Amino acid sequence: MTDSSPQSNPNAVPGAADVPAAAEGQQQQEQRRGRGDRDGRRGDRRGGRRGQERDSEWQERVVQIRRVSKTVKGGKKMSFRAIVVVGNEKGQVGVGVGKAGDVIGAVRKGVADGKKHLVKVPLTRHNSIPTLSNGRDGAASVLIRPAAPGTGVIAGGSIRTVLELAGIKNVLAKRLGSKTPLNNARAAMVALSLLRTHKETAKERGISLEQIYS
């Protein structure tokens, strides 16, 4: 007498009814986790691009790198000092100083310091300054005055770097006193910080805007 009951096949693939419910729940969690990881990576890429766009607005130029020393109990400690000018060529500029044991670290610190000391510069339609201004820092003095369209930036050294990164295209500048790059750059920053638009000047003097132009 033959047995008609089906024999079990060890190589047979289990069907959906044979898979426990707990295993199905685990598979669903893994699928959700995979989608979440992909979405997170996609979001990180978007955030990185936005950060790069913000950083690309700023330009930095190294004015000077010097090797300096500090006398300590054990002898002399050598380091580097970098003077960096940071600007977006849209009316914002800053001068920073950074010190570190290597040049790259000093420049990086100088850029961060420059972004902490930004000055907003009022620009005219022709990318010049509205009025004459004079700034001092230590023994350095800088005089800047507006110029006609097509004149360009008539300045030299660190003063020219500050004016160009501020977005000024037509200006005349005169250096008086010390020739130190850091003092001249800071004196130019003081002169730019003292600038006022014609509207602000009229409000401070208590007169109309027409009287300013007359």
From Swiss-Prot:
One of its GO terms (cellular component) is small ribosomal subunit. Residues 9-29 have a biased composition (Low complexity). InterPro entries: Ribosomal_Su5_D2-typ_SF (IPR020568), Ribosomal_uS5 (IPR000851), Ribosomal_uS5_bac-type (IPR005712), Ribosomal_uS5_C (IPR005324), Ribosomal_uS5_N (IPR013810), Ribosomal_uS5_N_CS (IPR018192), Ribsml_uS5_D2-typ_fold_subgr (IPR014721). One of its GO terms (biological process) is translation. Residues 30-60 have a biased composition (Basic and acidic residues). Residues 58-121 form the S5 DRBM domain. Transmembrane segments: none annotated. It comes from the Bacteria. Residues 1-61 are annotated as: Disordered. One of its GO terms (molecular function) is rRNA binding. Keywords: Ribonucleoprotein, Ribosomal protein, RNA-binding, rRNA-binding. Pfam families: Ribosomal_S5, Ribosomal_S5_C. Belongs to the universal ribosomal protein uS5 family. With S4 and S12 plays an important role in translational accuracy. Part of the 30S ribosomal subunit. Contacts proteins S4 and S8. The N-terminal domain interacts with the head of the 30S subunit; the C-terminal domain interacts with the body and contacts protein S4. The interaction surface between S4 and S5 is involved in control of translational fidelity. This is Small ribosomal subunit protein uS5. It comes from Synechococcus sp. (strain CC9605). The gene is rpsE.
